[in-house]
Amino acid sequence: MGKSPVIYAGPKLFPAAYKWKISFNENAKQVAWTNQYPEFNHNEFMGWTKQHVDKTYDVIDLRSKLEHPRVQKRFEVTERLLSGMRPAPIVVEAEGETLLQQLLWVFALGDFVTLYTALLIGLNPAPV
C-alpha cells in the first residue's frame, strides 16, 4: 500500500494485467503501469538497472503455466538479474486448467485486490 503497482505478464495473461492496471486506477485511485514479456526485456528492463530497491513501486508478476517455456524462463532470469535493483515481485500464479479459466480467475482476483486496497487506505472505490 502506498506504492504504485507495476504489473507484468506474458502474452496469455497480458489482458488481465492491463485490467489490473485499470482497476488500480479506478478502484484504488492509484497510478499503475503494466507491460508484457518478452517486450519488457527489450526496453523497460534497462530502466530498472539504475533504480534502487526502495523505490515506491510494487512489482506484480502474473504468471501462467500455459505460457511458452521461453516466457516462463524470462520471468525467472529477470528476477535473478534485477535482484537488488527493483522490489522483489509479488508472484501470482494463475489458477485453472484452461486459458479461459486462468483469465477469469486473474480478472476476479485483480478486482478483489484493488477493491480491498481501496478500502484499506480509506477510499471509496465506487466513484470513477
What does each model-identified segment do?
Residues M1-V128:
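A SIS-like phosphosugar-recognition module
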